Every structure is written in structure tokens, then in C-alpha cells.
Design a protein with these regions (language model features):
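Flexible loop/N-cap segments at domain edges
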Residues: 340-450, 454
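A short, proline-enriched helix->beta-strand linker immediately N-terminal to the Walker B motif
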Residues: 194-198, 517-526
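Hydrophobic anchor residue at the start of the ABC signature
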Residues: 188-189, 217, 515, 543
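Walker B catalytic motif
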Residues: 175, 204-205, 528-531, 535-539, ...
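ABC-family P-loop ATPase nucleotide-binding domains
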Residues: 94-178, 279-282, 452-517, 521-523
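ABC ATPase nucleotide-binding domain signature region
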Residues: 49, 62-141, 242, 249-250, ...
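Pre-Walker A (P-loop) beta-loop-beta motif of ABC nucleotide-binding domains
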Residues: 40-51, 83-85, 225-226, 397-408, ...
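Coupling and communication elements adjacent to P-loop NTPase active sites across diverse families
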Residues: 14, 19-31, 111-185, 266-389, ...
Length: 578
């Protein structure tokens, strides 16, 4: 095919169209024995902001890897505009521990590296060569026109705005190996922002962002002229896009024009139509099964060879159609809670019959006593520095938490929110945190369930089922094989998942394990640290509903504005000392 190169079973083509930037059709993509995609279509036009959503495990990260060129083991066609400048967030950083952050970011900026190399090297060898002198002059002019003379300073500003640098930290000395996984994700976002490419591909960009950083990102989204394709479940981000592509469990895609609110309305109508189609096919299956039986009986009763052949042909035709219909997977029906409330009784009952399985969260719902569970009185915490000195992390914090109350800790990344939770609830690392001022009073008999940002190390190297069993044993709770199977079912894990190492599971699957850990036992106080980061939209809704039903106390950290608005918490702001 002219202008195309074959990559395994994938075809990459280039097109001269001006508005079309990317047009992909994937007819087969598998992960192990599981077929993830069979009819996937993704397109992005010039300047368009498009989001990809879907259930955990549907294959969104795999699709991102395919579209960004990190995975070429698929069947299908990907067409890009000729000369397209594309930048994508990297999912892994193997072998880059010593890489300096600023050069790493600038390496992702089209033209910068080439022009910088020309400006640095041409003076050393051009002499009186007019061609090289002209090349050098053009490089200088282009470098200036692109604003590259002050780009390092601009990147440093972004590093500070996104909370990766503070105080007297030198940007020129910052290395990737010094950063957490969440901070590396922010580096990728900064790389995309400064790349000024035609098309930016971003995978869950706002995970681990604080509210100030997220607002900066959303502002950039609105103002930027470049096209974007974003894998996300962040409803604040989904509100800013112009189209949403849903990757379904059956390996197909549906495209919705508009932002999140418009997507929800269209999804309600699409789901109703899909349920009609599903019911029609179920009726057709029932009819075909009866026809097969009828043709068999008529064939047996007949004595005419021609009539027997006719019934045999009709039976084979019915069996072929039946086999085709029975191979079709049941669609994953989901309608958001507000739209469900708008359904008439008949449609609501039908949706209740056919809706997709969602996680089932059992929370403590016995009316509490409203007693005071936790008191923070002018608390100031600190960590010992290399010099031995202990500097305060934040200004004094005071708060009270009663049973039945919901409290949100707010503040920038690095302000000390997670550190405060660690100290208050004696989590891993609490011994390294010093109480410099004030007092912390937690009722000793209160049963606390914690949702960690990271899974505790002792469970990561165990198969999922064993990790659940170990978790219950470590907490002195009764556990049985039946209970393990029940939990796996309630949290949407498959039989294949149960023997997978926890460390090898997806972000969404790990998040569901964290929910199991938080709710193990009859908890009176739930502590959640960024719980919506890796959950899909239906799971986030179920978590919100479960927390709204919970009659104990809730203390959480989240930069998900929709999540916080639904829970309507009281708030405590953590102000960093430095």
C-alpha cells in the first residue's frame, strides 16, 4: 500500500487531509486469552478534545498503547495526517532513573532537540561554508520563533505550579528517579503541555494532581489549540471535552458528541435502545430454539425425501442463526443514578433486570451515637532532615470528627495531608513523623478502615485470593474460601484474576482490592486517600452511594470535585509551612 508500512498485523498510513489527524480501526486485539477489541473505532480531528471512557479491564490502557505506538501487536488500520506532530504520556520509565527531568521534558518537544543540537554544533564546523552558515541562521530564527530561548524557565515554572518543586529546590538537579509514580505522571503532563504538538495523547492525566494543579491543567485544556485524546474517568476533565468514546466490555466502541453531561443523557437513550435490541434478540433466540425442535419433529414424521431435505435445510438455517446470536455477548448496560431516576417504572424495572454488574459495597448502616471519635488540637507535624533538624510541615491544624460526620482534608500536593493521616492512624511510616505541637486524640476502641493510595508491600507479591485471605487473618477477622469467593464476585474479579499476583493487576483492580481492605470488619470510621483515582464511572458512583449510606464517620482526601460535592463534607485546609 503506497505510503504505508506494515507493522505485524497493523497498518499505519499517512493522509493529506487537513482536519483529520488520527483515524484508527482495530478489528482484533487480545491480552493473553482474552479478546479486548473486535470493532474499535477512534478518530480525532484538528483541535478536537476527545475522551475515552470504559469499565475497568475493558482495555483502555491497551488502546492507549496501541494508538501511541507503544504496542503494535494488533489487527487493524491507523491513519495519521502526513507530518503529524504527536506527543504521548509514557506509561513506563524503565532505565531512566538517572535522567534529569528538564532535558527529559524537552526531549518530548518537537524540533527543540534538533534545533538545539544545530545551534550548539554548527558553529564548531561551519567555518566559511555558506550552506552551513545559512543552516545555522535558519536554526537560530526558528529557535527564537518557537520561543525556545526561555523554554527551560517556562518548564521550571510548570514544575513549581504542579507541585514538583518547592522552596530553594533546583530544577536543573531534579531526576526522574527521585520522583514517585504519581509525580512522574505529572512530569508527563508537563511534557505534553510544552510540546505544543498537533495531537496530545494523555492517559489518566489528573490522577495524583491536587486541585490547584488540576485547575491549571483544565485551564490549559480550554485554551490550547492542539487536539487531545484523553483516557480518563475524571468528571471534571470529561466536562471539558467535545466528544466521548466509550470502550465497551464486548470489544466495541460507541461515540457520543458533547461533554460529560451530554454523554449521560445520550447514554440513557442509547442504553434503552440497546436493551430493546437485547430483548428482541432474546425473543429471537427463543423462537429459533422452538423452530429447531419443530423442524426436527416434522422431519421425523415426513416420508417424502424432498420434504425431509427441506426441513433439514430449514433446521440448519435456524441452527446457524441461533449459533450466531448465542455467541453475542450481553452488552454492559449502565445508566448514571440521576438518569435512572428519570426513567418511567417499566424502563426502570427493565434496567434493574439487565444492568451491568457493579461492585457491591457493604457499609455499616446502624444509627450511630454521634460521639466524638477524633480531635486534632493545633497539630503541627515534621520529619527529620538529613541535618537532624525537624522542620514543621504545615501550620497548626485543628478539627473534630464525630460519628455520622464527613470531613475533607484539602491542600496542595506535599502540604502534608497524607502525612497527617499516617500519623493520626499509625499507618506505615508513622514512626518517622514527629508531633511538634498540639495533640491528637483518637478513641482507642474505634474500628478504622483505611483506603491507601498504595497497596501495602506484604500483599503485593501474593495472588489476589491469598492476599484477601492474608488481609483478614492479619486483622484477626474470620475468613473462609466461601467468603473469599463472595468478595471476588462482589468486587467484579474473575476466576482468572484470583490467581494473578496483586502487583500485576490493573490500577482499577488494585483500587477494588483497596476497597475490600478498607471495609474488612465492621468499621466505624473510614479513611480514604484519593479513592477515585483508578475507579471507573459506575464504581465511583457505587462508592459515593455506599459512603452516603454509611452512618459512621468519614475522613477523606480527594481532588475530585464531583466526589466532594456529592458527600458534602466539612473541610479543613492544610497550609504548608514552607
Amino acid at each position: 500500500m503506497p505510503g504505508c508500512s506494515i507493522i505485524i498485523t497493523a497498518t499505519l498510513c499517512y493522509n493529506e487531509a487537513q482536519n483529520m489527524l488520527l483515524d484508527a480501526t482495530i478489528t482484533e486485539k487480545s491480552f493473553g486469552d482474552k479478546q479486548l477489541m473486535r470493532s474499535v473505532s477512534v478518530s480525532v480531528d484538528k483541535g478536537e478534545k476527545v475522551a475515552i471512557v470504559g469499565r475497568n479491564g475493558a482495555g483502555k490502557s491497551t488502546l492507549f498503547a496501541v494508538l501511541s505506538g507503544q504496542d503494535d501487536d494488533f489487527t487493524g488500520d491507523i491513519t495519521m495526517r502526513r507530518g503529524l506532530q504527536l506527543v504521548a504520556t509514557a506509561q513506563e520509565h524503565h532505565g531512566l532513573q538517572d535522567a534529569l527531568v528538564i532535558p527529559y521534558i524537552l526531549a518530548g518537544v518537537p524540533e527543540y532537540t534538533v534545533l538545539k543540537q544545530a545551534i550548539d554544533e554548527l558553529p564548531l564546523r561551519m567555518g566559511d561554508n555558506l550552506r552551513l552558515i545559512d543552516e545555522y541562521t535558519q536554526a537560530l530564527e526558528r529557535f527564537s520563533a518557537k520561543g525556545f530561548y526561555d523554554i527551560e524557565a517556562q518548564v521550571e515554572v510548570s514544575l513549581r505550579q504542579f507541585g514538583l518543586l518547592s522552596g530553594e529546590q533546583q530544577a536543573s538537579e531534579l531526576r526522574l528517579g527521585e520522583l514517585s509514580g504519581g509525580q512522574k505522571r505529572l512530569v508527563e503532563v508537563i511534557k505534553v503541555i510544552h510540546a505544543d504538538a498537533d495531537l496530545a495523547l494523555l492517559d489518566e492525566p489528573t490522577n495524583h494532581m491536587d486541585m490547584e494543579a488540576k485547575n491549571r491543567f483544565l485551564s490549559w485544556m480550554k485554551q490550547s489549540r492542539e487536539a487531545m485524546l484523553i483516557v480518563t474517568h475524571d468528571r471534571d476533565v470529561l466536562h471539558q471535552v467535545g466528544r466521548i468514546i466509550e470502550l465497551r466490555d464486548n470489544g466495541t466502541t460507541v461515540s457520543y458528541t458533547g461533554n460529560y453531561e451530554q454523554y449521560l443523557r445520550q447514554n440513557m437513550h442509547t442504553t434503552n435502545a440497546d436493551m430493546n435490541d437485547f430483548e428482541h434478540k432474546q425473543r429471537r433466540i427463543k423462537t429459533l430454539k422452538q423452530k429447531v425442535l419443530d423442524y426436527q419433529r416434522l422431519k421425523e414424521k415426513s416420508r417424502n425425501p424432498g420434504t425431509i431435505q427441506n426441513f433439514k435445510r430449514l433446521e440448519l438455517t435456524a441452527r446457524a442463526e441461533l449459533a450466531e446470536l448465542e455467541e453475542l455477548q450481553k452488552p454492559s448496560f449502565w445508566i448514571d443514578r440521576d438518569s435512572v431516576d428519570q426513567l418511567d417504572t417499566e424502563r426502570a424495572q427493565r434496567y434493574d433486570r439487565y444492568k451491568a454488574r457493579n461492585i457491591r459495597l457493604a457499609t455499616h448502616t446502624v444509627e450511630g451515637s454521634r460521639r466524638q471519635l477524633l480531635t486534632l488540637d493545633n497539630v503541627v507535624l515534621g520529619r527529620p532532615a538529613a541535618s537532624g533538624e525537624v522542620d514543621p510541615l504545615f501550620f497548626p491544624v485543628s478539627a473534630e470528627l464525630h460519628e455520622g460526620q464527613c470531613l475533607q482534608l484539602r491542600g496542595r500536593n506535599g502540604a502534608g495531608k497524607s502525612t497527617l493521616l499516617t500519623k493520626v492512624f499509625s499507618l506505615d511510616g508513622a514512626a518517622d513523623i514527629e508531633l511538634l505541637e498540639g495533640s491528637i486524640t483518637l478513641r482507642p476502641e474505634v474500628r478504622v478502615g483505611v483506603y491507601y493510595q498504595e497497596i501495602q508491600e506484604q500483599y503485593l507479591r501474593q495472588p489476589l485470593a491469598q492476599a484477601i485471605e492474608r488481609l483478614y487473618i492479619d486483622r484477626g477477622l474470620p475468613i473462609s474460601e466461601t467468603k473469599v469467593r463472595s468478595l471476588l464476585h462482589d468486587y467484579l474479579f474473575t476466576q482468572a484474576d484470583r490467581d494473578q499476583l496483586l502487583a500485576q493487576l490493573s490500577g482499577g483492580q488494585k483500587a477494588r482490592f483497596q476497597l475490600i481492605a478498607m471495609l474488612a470488619g465492621d468499621q466505624q470510621l473510614l479513611v480514604l486517600d484519593e479513592p477515585t483515582n483508578h475507579l471507573d464511572l459506575p464504581s465511583i458512583e457505587e462508592l459515593e452511594l455506599a459512603l452516603a449510606r454509611f452512618t459512621g464517620a468519614i475522613l477523606f482526601v480527594s481532588h475530585d470535585a464531583y466526589f466532594a460535592k456529592y458527600l458534602q463534607p466539612q473541610t479543613v485546609d492544610i497550609e504548608p509551612f514552607a
